[in-house]
Swiss-Prot record:
The gene is rps11. InterPro entries: Ribosomal_uS11 (IPR001971), Ribosomal_uS11_archaeal (IPR019961), Ribosomal_uS11_CS (IPR018102), Ribosomal_uS11_sf (IPR036967). Belongs to the universal ribosomal protein uS11 family. Part of the 30S ribosomal subunit. This is Small ribosomal subunit protein uS11. It holds the Pfam family Ribosomal_S11. PANTHER family: 40S RIBOSOMAL PROTEIN S14/30S RIBOSOMAL PROTEIN S11. It comes from Pyrobaculum islandicum (strain DSM 4184 / JCM 9189 / GEO3).
Length: 139
């Protein structure tokens, strides 16, 4: 091979999107948007892929939902995503639920190129009033 010959490289044009993963103790919701966040490409939840309500927060349901969302995104032309993971936050859990890591792995295995993974759980910088009010729940 001479210096003037270069191998033919297939340069795939990357079309980026954002995968928003909201994972609580009750469900996992995966939304894929364009980079601006204005146009929703795919929205799938754990409850859409399982029959029983008790299976909605499971990692298996999150994995199936992520596969389905990835197929919809690939069909619309998005082949690379940045991932933003969110837990309930506020007065609830500060960490994502059990389906978050399974959904990230499923997005990576489904053929999407993964860019950044970021945690965007809303965390209060002071305290917030609990749902039962100032003096607590009186039974």
């Amino acid at each position: 091979m001479s210096a003037t010959e270069q191998p033919q490289q297939q340069q795939q044009k990357l079309r980026w999107g954002i995968a928003w993963i909201y994972s609580s103790s009750n469900n996992t919701i995966i939304t894929i948007t364009d980079l601006t966040g204005a146009e929703t490409v795919a929205r799938v939840s754990g409850g859409m892929v399982v029959r029983a309500d008790k299976d909605k927060p499971s990692p298996w349901a999150a994995m199936q939902a992520a596969y389905k969302a990835a197929q919809l995104a690939l069909a619309r032309g998005i082949n690379a995503v940045h991932i933003k993971v969110r837990g309930p936050g506020g007065y609830g859990m500060k960490v994502p639920g059990p389906g978050a890591s399974a959904a990230i792995r499923a997005l990576a295995r489904s053929g999407l190129i993964i860019g950044r993974i970021e945690d965007v759980t809303p965390i209060p910088h002071d305290t917030i009033r609990p749902p039962s009010g100032r003096k607590g729940r009186r039974v």
